[in-house]
Amino acid sequence: MKNWTTEQQAAIDARGSNLLISAAAGSGKTAVLVERIIQIILKDKIDIDRLLIVTFTNAAAGEMRERIAGAIMEEMERKTEQEAHLRRQINLLNRASITTIHSFCIDVVRRHFHIIDVDPGFRIGDITETSIMRLEALEELFEEEYQGAHETFFRLVEAFGGTKEDRPLQDLVLKVYGFIQSQPYPEVWLKEKVGDFSLSIEDFDESLWIKTIKSRIEIQLKGAMDLLNNALSIAQEPGGPEVYEEAILSDLGQISELYDSLTLPITSFYEHLNHINHARLKPSKESDPVLKEESKNLRDKAKGIIKDIKDNIFTVSPEAYVEDLNKLHPLMDYLYQLVTGFTSRYAQKKADRGIVDFNDLEHYGLEILANELVAQEYQQRFEYIFVDEYQDSNIVQETLIQSIKRKDNLFMVGDVKQSIYRFRLADPSLFIEKYETFGEKEGDINRRIDLAKNFRSRGEVLAGVNYLFKYIMSKELGEIGYDHRAALYQGASFESIKEPSIEVNLIEKNMEIDEDIEEELQELADIEVEARIIAKRIKDLLNEEIYDEKNEVYRRLEFKDIVVLLRTTKNWAQSFLEAFIREGIPAYADANTGYFEAIEVGMFLNLLKVIDNKRQDIPLISVMRSPIGEFTTAELIDIRINDKNGTYYDAIEKYIEKNEDALKDKLVSFIEKLNKWGNEARYIKIDQFIWKLLMDTGFYYYVGAMPGGLQRQANLRILFDRASQFEKTSIKGLFNFIKFIEKLQGSKGDMGAAKILGENDNVVRIMSIHKSKGLEFPVVIAAGMGKNFNLRDTSADVLLHKDLGLGPKFVDSNLRTYRDSIAKLAMKDQIKIESLSEEMRILYVAFTRPKDKLIIVGSLRKIDRLVTNWNQADNIYSLMNAKSYLDWIGAALIKHPHGEVLRELGDFEFNELKYKAEDSKWTVNILGRQAVVLEEHEKRLKEEEYKEKLTHFNREDFSPHRHTEHKEEIDNRLNWQYPYPQATVIPSKLSVSDIKKANMGEMDSIVHQIPTLVKTPKFMEGKKALTAAERGTIIHFVLQHLALNQVGSEEEISQQIDLMVARELITEEEAQVVNVGKIVNYFKSEIGKRMLGAEKVYRESPFIIEKSAKDVIHGLSENLEEKLLVQGVIDCYFEEMDGLVLVDYKNDIVLNGDTASIMTRYDVQLMMYAEALERITGKQVKETYLYLFDVDQGVKR
């Protein structure tokens, strides 16, 4: 039995309460949640299918199901009297509601579709299809608006459209539509927020906008008074400028009065603000110059705060702001009409195609659960409801859960300090409200339990994290105070290590270096310098030891023990990868960006664009200059000279017309290829066309031979996969595919480069802090800590906020001027604070990943000025004005006993009274760029020396007459013959059917087979009978696409096939060859029933595995070490508790019931499939079947 802490045991045992478990990082929340579920099953005798367990990703749901299954199996091994009950839970586990909120909504909608009149056969729309549908709906809407010529619409276009087009306004409609989907009733919310713009000066004082502005000003004025009090203290020190006291006290009095006026109407505050004046400082010649300057600077900062309020908030009077809002009201109302108009058009397009998107699922679910009878059904069905990662919920998900919970059966677990998904519209205030209002006593109907013990990290790491966040995190910044309840406490014991656990490396960007390499210094990017310094630190780390708990020994650190965490991987990850590779450090970047920037992807997309339309200069020249076109720069110039003004394709046509030379022949051949590919693109599926193009051009193999070839080929396969997804939509053709990809690029939908390494490879991982959430590593290097925060969320023309609504700029069309409305000003402040709060929580996530060591690295400029700011940063206002993570870290460290390096830079004193007792241990280093730059300089000198030797190379010095002793060796090498001639005729890749042919003596037909392309379009083919292979393909296709919850009868299956015909997935002729009765028999067979009852079913799963050629093809030499790729497609496999079951469909005719000979024929194929599946999934294939449709029978291998 596990030894649970008192708090963990309380979370496991508590009943009769809604529980909020505030689980700190590394506190074992998932283990507690699983144990609570097991105890409910054991002690409360409640079946697992009477529980609703909500997670936020499918992967998390799968992991939760596996954990629960493992825990149940572990209990069964104890051989208690509850074994039968536990066995029942194993059987029920597949139908248990362990799910995401979207999957739960799918179940609700499918069960109760009649309540909202939605097609029960709906499917989830692919991102490709829905993106294009949104674009179409928007274009139709705007075309209709232009035809309607409504004056307010044109004013809206003028105010929020671009200078030459209306794209910004279209983007705004999409932005508002997307944003309001996080509200339970989107259009109602939007209408209410638009109504806020119609108000009087009396309403203005009570508006959320003014309350937000006042709250922000309150913090600013407190900051100003703190600065003035510090300035006054310095003025009163011995040697200080006493004559400054009068002016400083005057400022303090006026600002104190201004602060008090915040409780009055905003017009009164505005009057007080405009009456503030600052007295001139009296001369103080005999004062200490340092103290005088310090006191004056502090006062100037305080004056700057007042100036900021005047210049950036109250640029006009409150009455003028009210007038602005009233003028904006009709524009915002028309924006509301555009959004609702778009919503209805988009909804109709989805309905026409029988699809829904994820937002629909949530809102359909809400609409259905608003029905009391349905809500009561779910309240009775679920004895307990569990919500994991509750801090990432939004108000829609909260409303869904609240509608099906009872008064005391909700269990919510999470950590608001790790709420880092604001960009997905997560709302941490839901967690915070409960955190602050729930009681802590046993028996409270709403009860909070804190899990504060951390079982992941060393005490030294925890002490440092606690010190930092106690200093910087607060209710105002971070949205939760870091008090004793939020602090981390060590829960696990660790063996001691020699090296310090927390290290801070500050890289100063502007340290002095030798003049002769100053230019090189400028060329070396800041990111690259940081990456190189970290690379060297990693090499040093490999000489250090950590304690391996699993093997109970000290061991050297390995690459895979180290992770580099970045706030953003864009631009940064690639620089780090290159620096690590240069230093011989194997590395892997887990990034979601950089895909479209990959040269091979950009090049191939240009080829597709040119095939679609040759009159595009940049893509055309790009393709011609590439290995596909093989034109030289000189040839491209010669072509352009023929027509300097037209398109480049015009110049090509004129060159062909005027010239008779080799370049003309080359151009004619190139254009013929483009025309040929253009014709093929019209009648070949886009995914097949892309793959054929990769093979025809040899481009796939070309990039494979480049540095990083495997990665580049994987990137091209992603494009092929994306085309396969596109092909499944109702939108077809090369033009539409290109349009979709461009839309994806324009909407920042970068897919990220392909991933070719696994988690067990011995490499240093480079990932974003977001990706690291939930993970742990022995050593964490938090890099890029000096990078400025990205607060561009506040720069848009119209801001959006869940509480404050719409925040547009005000445009005066008569004066052609604009300014921020008070709504936008309020929102800018609020969004900035919320963004900074999330940045602080992101920092918390990063610093709570390490087990043994945390290394913090950041670059900065003008460190002498920064340390002054850090030393003065002792209030919320200062921390809110931080520009980077280093500003927070530095502000805490400069006051720490180990921050002497920083204090020395500014000659600051240590506040021994306040911070001496602090026991966390930090190592602070200030590094320069000199070493990196000097190393680069020496490297370039060596390269120049090598080039010089090559330039003056003398062939005579290496004449064979002078080196006859090498003649025999040269002859041997030139006359060498390859010892494995068999390897030269073995293909690099074989399908499973090819292997069967090879072993039947048909190798020649495989080696020399040439794929042919039938160029006759389908509409010219005429009618002809389908071959047996084609009939088999159709049946496989139908089995792949059938909705498995609607296969109980011939009627249900026939309806689905008719739908496939309607959507042009198959033709009517193809549908007629499908024997529906045979398919029904399959689903009613023993193996079919098992498949339908399985938790996870996978259909038509392609694979490629590497095998030794001699193990695959009979008769090859035992000495042959050649490898080949085996590819195939597994018809179906499904998961059961104790392994995988593989099923392969066959339409072979069975003579006299002789199924054994059929099995013998396909034995090798099934063996290959099973091996591939085990290698891919890491799970055991326990059973393998052929399903023979001819005799309606499943045959086990």
Curated annotation (Swiss-Prot):
Keyword ATP-binding listed? The answer is yes
Q: Which residues cross the membrane?
A: none
Report the gene name. Answer: addA
Q: Which SUPFAM superfamilies match?
A: P-loop containing nucleoside triphosphate hydrolases (SSF52540), Restriction endonuclease-like (SSF52980)
- What are the protein's GO molecular function terms? 3'-5' DNA helicase activity; 3'-5' exonuclease activity; ATP binding; ATP hydrolysis activity; double-stranded DNA binding
The UvrD-like helicase C-terminal domain extends over 485-774
Q: Which family does it belong to?
A: Belongs to the helicase family. AddA subfamily.
Cofactor(s) named in the record:
Mg(2+)
Subunit-level organization: Heterodimer of AddA and AddB/RexB.
Query: Which GO terms of type biological process are on file?
Result: double-strand break repair via homologous recombination
> What are the record keywords, sorted?
ATP-binding, DNA damage, DNA repair, DNA-binding, Exonuclease, Helicase, Hydrolase, Isomerase, Nuclease, Nucleotide-binding
Catalytic reaction annotation: Couples ATP hydrolysis with the unwinding of duplex DNA by translocating in the 3'-5' direction; ATP + H2O = ADP + phosphate + H(+)
> Which residues are noted in the entry as ATP-binding?
23-30
InterPro entries membership: AddA, DNA_helicase_UvrD-like_C, DNA_helicase_UvrD/REP, P-loop_NTPase, PDDEXK-like_dom_sf, PDDEXK_AddAB-type, Restrct_endonuc-II-like, UvrD-like_ATP-bd
From the Swiss-Prot or TrEMBL record, give the protein name: ATP-dependent helicase/nuclease subunit A
What EC number(s) does the entry state? 3.1.-.-, 5.6.2.4
A Pfam match? UvrD-helicase
Can you give the residue ranges of the UvrD-like helicase ATP-binding domain? 2-458
Q: What does this protein do?
A: The heterodimer acts as both an ATP-dependent DNA helicase and an ATP-dependent, dual-direction single-stranded exonuclease. Recognizes the chi site generating a DNA molecule suitable for the initiation of homologous recombination. The AddA nuclease domain is required for chi fragment generation; this subunit has the helicase and 3' -> 5' nuclease activities.
One GO cellular component term: DNA helicase complex
